[in-house]
Amino acid sequence: MALQGSGQISFSQIENEFGQNGERSLGDYRTSQSVGELSNLPLDSGIPTSGQIKFSDFYSKRLNIVVDMHSGGDEFRKSAKNDKWNNNNLTVIGGFRSKKEDGSKIIVHVNKKFGSDKSSVNNCAVRTGSWNSSSSIQVDIGGEGQILGAGGDGGQGGVCLGGGQPGGTGTSGLGIDHNGVTVNVLSGGIIRAGFGGGGGGGGGRQTDKGSDRRASGGGGGGGAGFPAGNGGQPGNGCANGSSGSGGNETTAGDGGGGGNNGNQAYGASGGEGGQFGEAANGGGSSQAGGGSGGGDGAAIRRNSGFSVTINNSGTIQGDQNATGVS
């Protein structure tokens, strides 16, 4: 637990919280440590790193632990608690003791790229995980940190006279499943939703003098995200349309063109996928209707009723108040 906020405080209380330094000296708790992009970290905020140090400097202070979500290459769908903390991917500030969850300040430091998957809008690239209620949890996203939802796939074009299929839904960036978390996005840091895929185009038909011509619709474009949405397949079996193009991290893919049967029957084009500021388009309609565009994920999601404090000096693109985390 955090140390008391007033009255007499003993050296043994300080040692119980922060661990025993080699000299058993108050002065040896003047530490300045860098972890990832976090530099000059004191033992806890307000404890001196040099100069005079006194017992009252430790009032209300607690052990600080940085969870490592900054080392290595890109990752997908990771929980700070389950995947990192539980596997000891962390740094205890000061280095005087082993990790301790109860009452500690847990700093989840993100300074690389994380992506989500495409299976559910609630799925997040990074989750805080659930912690002891006495712990203080903050997420610090450094200048190279990116937390990105996945883009939805484009819908398939209508087959012959069939309707186009809807585009896939984008998924989400940061998931908060601990109450009272503070999120700090530093300059250059990014949290971004994944965006929906475009709908597939509808099939077309033309009849005259015993002729019955049909044409399939084009596939929808993929939504922006990481991973990005794939372009939708065209309808087939009649005059085939074209596939939609895939998106990338920031830009949506285009819908594919509809099929052309003898310049008489025309399938409709697929819709463009979604990107920040532009919702995914539905597929065009011919004799059959186009599929709807997929919805967007959220930049930040939280469990219902949870409070989150957001300090943003970087970039957050997408809804910050969506509920439901998985």
Residues of each region from the PLM?
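Glycine-centric low-complexity repeats
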Residues: A2-S326
